[in-house]
Amino acid sequence: MTKTKAIDIIGAPSTFGQRKLGVDLGPTAIRYAGLISRLKQLDLDVYDKGDIKVPAVNIEKFHSEQKGLRNYDEIIDVNQKLNKEVSASIENNRFPLVLGGDHSIAVGSVSAISKHYNNLGVIWYDAHGDLNIPEESPSGNIHGMPLRILTGEGPKELLELNSNVIKPENIVLIGMRDLDKGERQFIKDHNIKTFTMSDIDKLGIKEVIENTIEYLKSRNVDGVHLSLDVDALDPLETPGTGTRVLGGLSYRESHFALELLHQSHLISSMDLVEVNPLIDSNNHTAEQAVSLVGTFFGETLL
């Protein structure tokens, strides 16, 4: 990422990939926490493209025990629209910063981005692998499947968005501490570069990020997408997210990680997902998210 590249902020207020209302308010909460002014203070050209239009939530259906893939038609609609917006951003030579919404929106964003690169790398900063397939998913929640879909396995209509699948060997998972059985097997079968919380405890976040950067460079990637799920952070510090897992990354560790990623100039696009202000405390999680994004784009104390 160059320092002069303009940024498109694109909201994707989807709540359909999981079961807790409120994550659709994530883009609003993040903007309210000062994202735009924070980035403009860094002398960046910032274009807020607003939110894509998403289907209305049918409360009765949303809370029902749906069989199979939950809210599938709505998720197709959201990701088709987001795919077009993100693709247009790249065609205009801008850096797409996508605000979720739940993590199912990464299908639309990353599939759009991958069309414009020959060998895209992906950093998945998350407590979860999001590598389930419908047949193995314990919940049917599609926010647990986007990365598997992006590698070329999953529901037909979502796969159709993805004409240039992500190679498993171009993926780095950071912050893992909750993986389903099928996800663990997929990671082992494809030898996906993975840093669990145990690895981070042993190595430290500095070495983890430096190893990530060197690994992706060795893969000769021509772009890297950063998908940052705030549930990667420990919920005792960062409570406003729907799939909390204790023992996560600290805010300080994440701050330093994003500082190192900024210095690498490797990242060409970004998602920020799973901020849910309805289960937050005084918009604290959105404020942390804004601070992390500011760090990623070059904000420093001195």
Curated annotation (Swiss-Prot):
Record: residues binding substrate: H128, G129, D130, L131, N132, S139, G140, N141, D180, T243, E274
Gene Ontology CC terms, in alphabetical order: cytoplasm
Keyword Hydrolase annotated: yes
Residues holding Mn(2+) 1: H103, D126, D130, D229
Keyword Disulfide bond set for record: no
Organism superkingdom: Bacteria
Top enzyme class: hydrolase
GO molecular function list: arginase activity; manganese ion binding
Gene Ontology biological-process entries: arginine catabolic process to ornithine; urea cycle
Protein name: Arginase
Organism expressing this protein natively: Staphylococcus aureus (strain COL)
Name of the gene this protein is made from: arg
